[in-house]
Amino acid sequence: MRVVGEIPHPDCKITLFAWNNRYLIKFEQGLLEQTFKIHEYDVTSEADLRALVDETFISETLSRFEAMRNSLRNRLNVIG
């Protein structure tokens, strides 16, 4: 797996990878992560890959992190 780059953001870590004829966009926030896989033929360049990760996409991803955190917290409360 090759690191293509990182996209700076104050609320999460965003790393771009190239691997196995795919690009991966990995978001990390604390102990949670989300990875999006995109076939390399669906974008024409790494610049296109970066263009996909706009503020709308990041905002939607951050909202999912909140939902993931709530879901995990609720499940941990069941066993705790």
Question: Which role does the model predict for each range below?
Answer:
Residues 1-34:
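N-terminal acidic leader/helix
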Residues 36-41:
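Generic detection of short hydrophobic beta-strand segments and adjacent strand-loop junctions
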Residues 42-80:
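Mixed-charge, Lys/Arg-enriched low-complexity segments
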